[in-house]
């Protein structure tokens, strides 16, 4: 597994990124979780101790897809989502931490690209039209971000 845990007794920081990777035609890249077949999502991951959020997004995109992007390639939506960490995952975080704060970014690709998924984390990928992608994802925050994508693209 290519996940690295943040410093501080090996516990994760309750701050993460969600990165929507999409084409100009609003096709959205989704990854299928290895441990949960049928669980589709965009790129996600936890911030490491000394990283800026854009660095976290760049690192997670590279780790989960093999796509090389720089901080300037990303669009920071200045949008955060706060959600409860499922009880079965709380042992990964400091004691008494029950919520995560997720920061949303997007990455525009000129066209669909071949993706190299991290086998320990994901079992496959698909490019879907944004409406289908919104229906396919498990997470409400991922769904809501995908549903905002057409408006975000028009306003950028």
What are these regions (language model features)?
Residues 2-11, 88-96:
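Short, P/G- and charge-enriched loop/turn segments at secondary-structure junctions
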Residues 30-33:
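Short, acidic/hydrophobic/Gly-rich beta-strand patch recurrent on exposed beta strands
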Residues 3-28, 46-49:
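Conserved N-terminal beta-strand and adjoining loop/helix that marks the start
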Residues 36-39:
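A conserved beta-turn-beta hairpin within the catalytic core of GNAT-like acetyltransferases
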Residues 41-44:
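A short gly/proline-enriched turn/hairpin at secondary-structure junctions
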Residues 47-141:
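Unchanged
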Residues 135-156:
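Charged phosphate-binding loop/patch that engages nucleotide di/tri-phosphates or the phosphate backbone
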């Amino acid at each position: 597994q290519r996940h690295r845990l943040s410093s501080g007794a090996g516990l994760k920081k309750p701050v993460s990124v969600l990165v929507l990777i999409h084409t100009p035609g609003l096709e959205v890249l989704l990854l299928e979780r290895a441990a949960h077949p049928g669980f589709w999502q965009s790129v996600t991951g936890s911030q490491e101790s000394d990283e800026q959020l854009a660095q976290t997004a760049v690192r997670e995109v590279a780790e989960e897809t093999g796509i090389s992007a720089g901080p300037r390639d990303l669009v920071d939506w200045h949008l955060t989502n706060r959600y409860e960490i499922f009880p079965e995952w709380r042992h990964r975080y400091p004691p008494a931490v029950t919520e995560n704060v997720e920061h949303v970014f997007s990455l525009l690709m000129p066209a669909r690209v071949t993706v190299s998924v991290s086998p320990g984390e994901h079992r496959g990928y698909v490019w879907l039209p944004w409406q289908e992608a919104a229906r396919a994802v498990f997470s409400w925050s991922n769904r809501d971000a995908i549903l905002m994508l057409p408006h975000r693209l028009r306003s950028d």
